[in-house]
């Protein structure tokens, strides 16, 4: 790819449920299918997109590893399509720089992929109990932990780490770009408006007003202090000039995992908190997951 553009506001708000979006006809390297799944837990329909690899339609009996790729705050299930990320993935497939696997992007609003503070929006329960089983039944996903990964960007990075650290028995690998990790919560007071602005980006999933105790209970860094993560492959990176200071949180997670002698891959790269940074490092995250799949799956490519 010569250019990855940042999504326009109107594109961020697009959400076509039940439609099928095809890759450009001139490039038969895969396609994206955007559909929806009814949820009893959330009492609504949830839209999602699946990037199907080049061989999916031709090889009718073949099954594939699956990567759940979670979007950031303010985005939606079509973020890879309207940002140019789908073209990036297709380039990797076309140039044989990435093996084939399913990439699934569910819509999550501002949920942070957790069960909300008020208990009314149980997104984590939905994801594990309804979404994963539904998607893996509809599409030809290889069964079992060894063929399943989860990753995300910003809020999605938080969600991926949160879910994988709480349920490591379900995933072979987890990855995150610029995950919404906060090293130390600021003093919450009306006078501390500058620090409070960092909390507003978290939305109301953690309570309104913000509940520090609930945050700590769900914080991936807190969970990682005691979680049994043996066998889970871990990758995360962050820009050294992250606009929200999430680089400090990423460094704290790196320090914690190192102190526990938990193998992981962490990178602090030059850059901020934007699509340009994510696009530059997305290939490395995808390749990380494919290498994990390749080491465990019968036929990963």
Where are these regions (language model features)?
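Positively charged n-region of N-terminal signal peptides that target proteins for export
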Residues: 1-6
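Non-catalytic cap/lid and distal C-terminal segments of serine-dependent acyl enzymes
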Residues: 27-301
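Bacterial N-terminal signal peptides
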Residues: 10-20
């Amino acid at each position: 790819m010569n250019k990855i553009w940042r999504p326009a506001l109107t594109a961020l708000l697009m959400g076509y449920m039940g439609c099928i979006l095809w890759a450009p006809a001139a490039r038969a390297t895969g396609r994206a299918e955007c559909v929806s799944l009814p949820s009893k837990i959330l009492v609504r329909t949830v839209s999602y997109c699946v990037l199907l690899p080049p061989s999916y339609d031709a090889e009718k009996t073949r099954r594939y590893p699956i990567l759940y790729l979670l979007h950031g705050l303010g985005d939606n299930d079509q973020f890879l399509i309207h940002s140019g990320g789908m073209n990036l993935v297709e380039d990797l497939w076309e140039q044989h720089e990435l093996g084939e696997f399913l990439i699934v992007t569910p819509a999550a609003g501002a949920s942070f992929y957790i069960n909300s503070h008020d208990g009314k929006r149980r997104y984590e329960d939905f994801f594990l109990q309804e979404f994963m089983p539904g998607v893996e039944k509809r599409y030809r996903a290889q069964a079992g932990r060894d063929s399943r990964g989860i990753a995300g960007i910003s809020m999605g990075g938080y969600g991926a780490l949160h879910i994988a650290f709480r349920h490591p028995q379900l995933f072979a690998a987890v990855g995150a770009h610029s995950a919404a990790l906060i090293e130390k919560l600021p003093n919450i007071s009306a006078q501390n408006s500058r620090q409070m602005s960092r909390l507003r980006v978290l939305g109301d999933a953690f309570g309104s007003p913000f509940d520090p105790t609930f945050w700590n209970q769900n914080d991936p860094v807190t969970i990682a202090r005691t979680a049994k993560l043996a066998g889970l492959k871990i990758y995360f990176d962050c820009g050294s000039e992250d606009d929200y200071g999430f680089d400090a949180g990423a460094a704290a997670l790196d320090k914690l995992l190192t102190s526990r002698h938990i193998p992981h891959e962490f990178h602090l790269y030059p850059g901020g908190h934007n699509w340009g940074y994510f696009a530059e490092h997305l290939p490395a995250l995808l390749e990380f997951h494919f290498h994990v799949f390749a080491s465990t799956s019968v036929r990963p490519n």
